[in-house]
Each structure stands twice: as C-alpha cells, then as structure tokens.
Design a protein with these regions (language model features):
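Metallo-beta-lactamase
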Residues: 1-8, 22-25, 30, 67, ...
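Short, surface-exposed beta-strand/loop micro-motifs that present aromatic residues
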Residues: 14-17
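Residue-level signal for tight coil/turn positions that link beta-strands
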Residues: 20-21, 96
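Active-site HxH/HxHxD metal-binding segment of metal-dependent hydrolases
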Residues: 6-10, 29-97
Length: 184
C-alpha cells in the first residue's frame, strides 16, 4: 500500500503492490515510494481500473521499472494522453499473471476490476466501482453526469457472484480501502 493521496476532501486513494507477480494496482500520486517498491521487487505489471488513475506517474513508473501498463480498452484514448497502454483490456479473462480481468463498466465506461489469489484468499480490486463508507456500508461508484446507472447495476450483479475474501478499492472514505468480506 502506497502513501495516501487526498484528491478531494474526505476521499483517500492508495496504490497496492501484489508481490506474487510484482503487479501494481491503481496508481500512486507521487514517486515518493519508488525505492520501497524497488525493495519489494519492483513493478513488472501495472493495472489501472479506469481513466481517473491515469496521470504523470504512469510515465515515471514505466521509466523506473520498465513495467507493462494494462488498462481498459474503452478508455484507451484518455489513458494514452499520459502514457501508452501496452495491454488493452476489453474482455473477461485470466491473464498470464494469474489476474482475473473483469470489465465492470458503469462508474466509467471502462471500469475494470481484478481478482487475484492471495495468502488470505481471493482479493478483489474494485477501483471506484464499489467502495466502503465510514459507517461500513458499501457504496456503488455512481456519479451524476459521468456514470451509467443501468450498466453499473449489471456490473454490481456480476461482482456479487464472485465471493472474494478481501475487497480493495482505489478510493475510499474513512480509514481504509481494504475490507475482509464475511461469508453470508
């Protein structure tokens, strides 16, 4: 987990390194933790959940680590303004790193979630498609004027079938973006 960034009052973001594949999920706001990422093995693969994670750090990460950028095909133009996308992601599949790529449009047209195996079960990286509120409720990432309500509802129905053990969002309200999911 990288240092927090606060793009809006009350909203916090992090990026997360999955060391099993040296895969970075989301994007850090600064290069302040590049040394720590290097100490953990670096970044070989960089996964974005949607266009809002694209920014100046994409070039910095690629330059520092030689990483492969994987990002939603539906938002390729927006993301490519910051750095070229090496692997456009448009369909549900398990990639060569063991990451299940799950397109979940609705928050944005290209919103994508990722399901990975981990030490404590299955980890679902949801981007901003689903986040936890400070009072413990789940919030669907619907934003007037940007999101598609019906498409997001379909994506949420899909996510409900996955049964992850841990959910990790890119943005969050409250203390943490990492939440263990209790069975039932």
């Amino acid at each position: 987990e990288t240092r927090p960034d606060n793009p809006f009052p009350g909203l916090t973001t992090h990026a997360y390194l999955w060391t099993a594949a040296n895969a970075l999920f989301y994007s850090p706001a600064t290069d302040a933790e590049f040394d720590q990422l290097s100490d953990l093995g670096g970044v070989t693969h960089h996964y974005l959940s949607h266009r809002d994670e694209a920014g100046p750090m994409l070039k910095g990460i690629a330059r520092q680590f030689g990483s492969t950028l994987r990002a939603p095909l539906a938002e390729l133009d927006d993301i490519a303004e910051h750095h070229r996308v090496d692997v456009p992601l448009g369909s549900r599949h398990v990639d060569s790193n063991g990451v299940e790529v799950i397109p979940t449009p609705g928050h944005t047209p290209g919103s994508t979630c990722y399901l990975v195996p981990g030490a404590e079960g299955r980890y679902l990286f949801t981007g901003d498609t689903v986040i936890r509120t400070p009072d413990g409720d789940w919030w669907a990432g619907y934003l007037d004027g940007m999101s598609d309500r019906h498409t997001l509802a379909e994506s949420l129905r899909l996510l409900a079938t996955l049964s992850p053990d841990v959910v990790i969002s890119s943005a969050f309200l409250g203390d943490t973006a990492v939440h263990r999911v209790e069975p039932g």
